[in-house]
């Protein structure tokens, strides 16, 4: 499937799910039952095999047990797996053959996921600080985040600082290499000039005096 056709199909999926399609980022994002979702295809070879990503925390700070996860995965034939890491919730969906089936799968999985989270007293939150505030979807450094305005500002600032430090380190390394090369060249030039003037000295050991 060529890129133009893929974009057209993704736009149809967006219309059918109420999500927004970001053509530049190649992902969908939007809200369902108060939860901020990012939806993307992790493998370009399978454009209709999606992953749902959101951030949520339980009322008591606990995580899902294996039995609850197993029950959720069995609740829908469209769900392949469920993953939880800290505040990250990821739901992998089974691959579909076309845009229409992908749209139906997304609607079913989004509804099932929000119901599962709400039933287990989970609420939407910021990926970093964990506060129950409005968040926005972001992709930085190949990772996906749901960030509140304060954490977004902090993350952007940290990235800018690291980028600046990396650039400075590069400049220092280049400067050191150039300095070493110049020093070496100047040393060779000095030896050459001195040798032309007859000032190159040789170190030698004088012979011991004979008795």
Question: What are these regions, as identified by a protein language model?
Answer:
Residues 67-76, 85-122:
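Ampiphathic alpha-helical segments that act as solvent-exposed interaction surfaces
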Residues 154-176:
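Cytosolic-side membrane-insertion boundary helix
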Residues 137-145:
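Short linker/helix segments within small regulatory modules
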Residues 130-133, 155:
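Cys/His-rich microdomains that often coordinate metals
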Residues 126-129, 148-151:
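Short cysteine-rich clusters marking metal-coordination/redox-active sites
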Residues 1-73:
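Short Lys/Arg-enriched alpha/beta "domain-start" segment
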Residues 204-211:
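Conserved small/polar residues in nucleotide/adenosyl-binding loops
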Residues 195-203:
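Short, non-helical or kinked segments that cap or interrupt transmembrane helices
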């Amino acid at each position: 499937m060529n890129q133009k056709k893929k974009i057209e199909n993704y736009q149809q999926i967006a219309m059918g799910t109420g999500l927004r399609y970001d053509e530049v980022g190649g992902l969908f994002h939007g809200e369902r039952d108060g939860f901020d979702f990012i939806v993307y295809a992790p493998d370009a070879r399978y454009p209709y095999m999606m992953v749902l990503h959101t951030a949520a925390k339980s009322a008591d700070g606990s995580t899902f047990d294996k039995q609850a996860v197993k029950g959720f995965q069995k609740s829908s034939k469209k769900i392949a797996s469920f993953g939880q890491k800290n505040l990250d919730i990821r739901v992998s969906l089974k691959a579909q053959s076309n845009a229409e089936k992908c749209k139906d799968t997304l609607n079913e999985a989004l509804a099932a996921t929000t119901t599962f989270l709400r039933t287990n007293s989970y609420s939407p939150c910021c990926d970093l600080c964990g506060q129950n505030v409005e968040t926005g979807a972001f992709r930085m450094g190949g990772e996906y985040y749901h960030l509140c305005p304060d954490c977004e500002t902090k993350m952007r600032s940290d990235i800018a600082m690291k980028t600046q430090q990396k650039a400075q380190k590069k400049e220092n390394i280049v400067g050191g290499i150039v300095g070493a090369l110049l020093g070496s060249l100047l040393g060779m030039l000095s030896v050459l000039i001195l040798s032309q003037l007859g000032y190159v000295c040789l170190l030698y050991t004088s012979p011991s005096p004979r008795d």
